[in-house]
Amino acid sequence: MEFPVVDYPATLGRAYDRLYVAEADGPSALPTRLARVTVPDGEATTWSEPGAFPGEPIFVRAPADADTEGALLSVVLDAESDETFLVVLDATTMDELARATLPHRLPYGFHGQFYAADDPVRSMA
């Protein structure tokens, strides 16, 4: 398991009951799936696609009145089609909600970071 993330604003300094990770399945050195892991039992719900290598998951919390925990975003390299896409998953079920193919292939990267346009300081929110 690599790149573990939690809902930082809701769990900072407190116990949490789930985390999201990228993990390798089989002999691959690169992550081949994204997983929602419940703590402490280690039960995992996953998303994967043949020939696809997801990057670091980014958790986006849903509004308080939503029926889901939020969304999980990841930039994915599809080695079979030589394309890169952004996948949006339901963070509760790990079902794919949306996908946006980028106009050009991005090399596989280790971390994905997002910055507010008016604040270059990294935000965990």
List PLM regions with ranges.
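Beta-propeller domains
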Residues: 1-125
